[in-house]
Regions:
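Single conserved hydrophobic/aromatic residue that forms the stacking wall/gate
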Residues: 1-13
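Generic structural signal for small/hydrophobic residues in well-ordered secondary structure
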Residues: 23, 32, 94, 129, ...
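Short beta-strand segments
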Residues: 32-34, 90-98, 119, 145-148
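Formylglycine-dependent
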Residues: 36-88, 98
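Short, solvent-exposed loop/turn segments at secondary-structure junctions
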Residues: 36-40, 96-101, 150-153, 159-160, ...
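A long, amphipathic alpha-helix that forms part
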Residues: 74-85, 107-148, 154-155, 175-181
């Protein structure tokens, strides 16, 4: 039963704590495919976000140190997606780890992460997305929301990486679009 926030309003408030749990409540299969260790379920912090989903997965081959992590994650996602009938609503969250450090292995001979290796990691992840998008297209029209969880410093103001308070870390790319069947 949806509760209306205002009479005549199209806005509703669910009685679940998170957006993901609310989608599950209205019939979505919710799937999380983790990349970084925050999704590993190996400790308390690694169980929090995956716990919001009906199904959550993490494998070492999805992690930051596996050069083929995005391909592994997309292969896994497509396999899982194809197990559901086309009329089953699916919300899938994928945490692509390839962009996180270390990403220097995406540039031959590079020993340290920098903007060049970060860009190469982004190109690598982007190269894997068409297979995932095609799997969703075969099902139905799909809303895609693509965003980062944080930015990264590569020497700006003397800072490296993202575990700091800096404008570059707070700058997060975002894009949404509809994939048509």
């Amino acid at each position: 039963e949806m509760q209306r926030s205002l009479v005549g309003s199209e806005m509703c408030i669910r009685d679940r704590a998170t957006f993901v749990q609310s989608l599950a409540q209205v019939g979505y299969e919710t799937i999380c495919i983790g990349g970084v260790n925050f999704f590993s379920k190996r400790n308390d912090i690694g169980r929090v976000f995956p716990g919001y989903f009906n199904k959550s997965y993490w494998l070492p081959t999805f992690g930051c140190t596996d050069k083929n992590s995005a391909a592994n994650q997309v292969d896994f996602a497509v396999d899982k997606l194809e197990k559901y009938p086309a009329d089953r609503k699916v919300f899938m969250y994928i945490n692509f780890s390839a962009i996180h450090y270390p990403n220097c292995h995406y540039v031959e001979g590079k020993k340290k992460d920098d903007k060049e290796s970060h860009a190469a990691a982004l190109r690598y992840v982007d190269s894997q997305l068409p297979r995932l998008f095609e799997a969703f297209r075969r099902r139905s029209d799909t809303l895609v929301i693509a965003l980062s969880d944080h930015g990264t410093c590569y020497g700006e103001d003397g800072y490296e990486y993202h575990c700091i308070s800096h404008e570059k870390v707070y700058t997060v790319p975002y894009k949404h679009f509809i994939l048509r069947k």
